[in-house]
Amino acid sequence: MTGVDDISSNVHKLVGVTAGMNTAASTGPMNLVLDKCSVVLEELRTIQILTETHSEGLSEQLKMTEKNILEMENLFDQIDQLCLFVQKAKSDLDKLEKLYNVVDRQ
């Protein structure tokens, strides 16, 4: 039964420390640990906020990059169409020039 008594005693001491029922001398190390934990918790919260803000900014940049890539793809498609048009126009112009030369010779 000593194990149960030890656990019960430890639980009572813990409740006494957290409830402030013990003297300040006995809670000094616990207060130090709690203070350090509070500081670390605040730092972690700050890091969380900064990370969330940074990730939102990255998300917006990613959306803009995707939009720019789509615009570039459309631009390349239009360039390809323009090349085809120029080739066809050059071919038509060559044919007209040959026809003109034939008619001019007659």
UniProtKB/Swiss-Prot annotation:
This is Biogenesis of lysosome-related organelles complex 1 subunit 4. The gene is blos-4. Component of the biogenesis of lysosome-related organelles complex-1 (BLOC-1) composed at least of blos-1, blos-2, blos-4, dsbn-1, glo-2, mutd-1 and snpn-1. Interacts with glo-2. Keywords: Coiled coil. GO terms for biological process: endosomal transport; positive regulation of gut granule assembly. GO terms for cellular component: BLOC complex; BLOC-1 complex. Belongs to the BLOC1S4 family. Residues 53-106 form a coiled coil. Signal peptide: none annotated. Disulfide bonds: none annotated. It comes from Caenorhabditis elegans. Component of the biogenesis of lysosome-related organelles complex-1 (BLOC-1) involved in gut granule biogenesis.
